[in-house]
């Protein structure tokens, strides 16, 4: 596989450990939700998302009901756009207060910097909101890496297991699918990207997946343990 025209990467389980997201970020947002909703429910950046949750679920517009719904979604790792937007706002305070910094795998940091230095456009596609993605890379233990990226995509462009989402991304960045490599730890996402012609790489880290995965469709994708093994 030669150097691509652009690289699109997932975050959780790909550039960063699953445990950081599930054991640090998710619990932090869960704990902060009651106070956040109480203090910001009328804020113009918050109210539309709470309204959406109430309308879609038939939940009475009360703080307790909304918090209970959102916490359940966190517990089940829901990718709902409203939840991701609200989580991002909560995490912003955590980053600003120095409550945590982002974990990034050293091999990912090294390759991201090298690709940027080689003028390869880098893009992020994650279920987390774009502001949350930017915070994630801005407040990492390796420093502010947000400037390495040319663009950011979240579920507003479509679900990560839907091939049309990758078509929209390719159109947005102006590069044919065959010129783009997508890096992810989720086989269903890679299948969707490959369906419209993206080159795909399954990142199968032992820290996140102790047993190498040899499942249906695994062999459709370049299958590596880390960014260090990438041939470009």
From Swiss-Prot:
Molecular function GO labels: 2,3-diketo-5-methylthiopentyl-1-phosphate enolase activity; 2-hydroxy-3-keto-5-methylthiopentenyl-1-phosphate phosphatase activity; acireductone synthase activity; magnesium ion binding
InterPro entries: Enolase-ppase_E1, HAD-like_sf, HAD-SF_hydro_IA, HAD_sf
Superkingdom assignment: Bacteria
This enzyme's EC code(s): 3.1.3.77
Statement: the UniProt record of this protein carries the keyword Repeat: no
Catalyzed reactions per annotation: 5-methylsulfanyl-2,3-dioxopentyl phosphate + H2O = 1,2-dihydroxy-5-(methylsulfanyl)pent-1-en-3-one + phosphate
Keywords carried by this UniProt record: Amino-acid biosynthesis, Hydrolase, Magnesium, Metal-binding, Methionine biosynthesis
Residue ranges that the Swiss-Prot or TrEMBL entry lists as coiled coil: none
Cofactor binding mode and count: Binds 1 Mg(2+) ion per subunit.
Family listed: Belongs to the HAD-like hydrolase superfamily. MasA/MtnC family.
Protein purpose: Bifunctional enzyme that catalyzes the enolization of 2,3-diketo-5-methylthiopentyl-1-phosphate (DK-MTP-1-P) into the intermediate 2-hydroxy-3-keto-5-methylthiopentenyl-1-phosphate (HK-MTPenyl-1-P), which is then dephosphorylated to form the acireductone 1,2-dihydroxy-3-keto-5-methylthiopentene (DHK-MTPene).
Annotated protein name in UniProt: Enolase-phosphatase E1
Originating species: Xylella fastidiosa (strain M12)
Gene, per the UniProt record: mtnC
């Amino acid at each position: 596989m030669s150097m691509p025209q652009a690289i699109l990467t997932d975050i959780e389980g790909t550039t960063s450990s699953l445990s950081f997201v599930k054991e640090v970020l998710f619990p932090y947002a869960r704990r902060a939700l009651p106070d956040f909703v109480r203090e910001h429910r009328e804020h113009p950046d918050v109210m539309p998302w709470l309204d959406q949750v109430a309308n879609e679920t038939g939940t009475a517009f009360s703080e307790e009901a909304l918090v209970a719904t959102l916490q359940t979604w966190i517990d089940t790792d829901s990718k709902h756009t409203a939840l991701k937007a609200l989580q991002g706002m909560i995490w912003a305070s955590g980053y600003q207060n120095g409550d945590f910094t982002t974990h990034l795998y050293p091999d990912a940091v090294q390759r991201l910097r090298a690709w940027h230095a080689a003028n390869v456009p880098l893009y992020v596609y994650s279920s987390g909101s774009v502001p949350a993605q930017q915070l994630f890379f801005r407040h990492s233990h390796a420093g502010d890496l947000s400037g390495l990226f040319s663009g950011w995509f979240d579920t507003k462009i479509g679900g990560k297991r839907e091939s049309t989402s990758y078509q929209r991304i390719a159109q947005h960045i102006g590069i044919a699918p065959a010129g783009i490599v997508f890096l992810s730890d989720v086989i269903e996402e890679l299948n969707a990207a490959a369906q419209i012609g993206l080159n795909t790489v399954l990142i199968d880290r032992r820290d996140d997946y102790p047993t190498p995965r040899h499942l249906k469709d695994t062999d459709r994708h370049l299958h590596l343990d880390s960014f260090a093994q990438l041939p470009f």
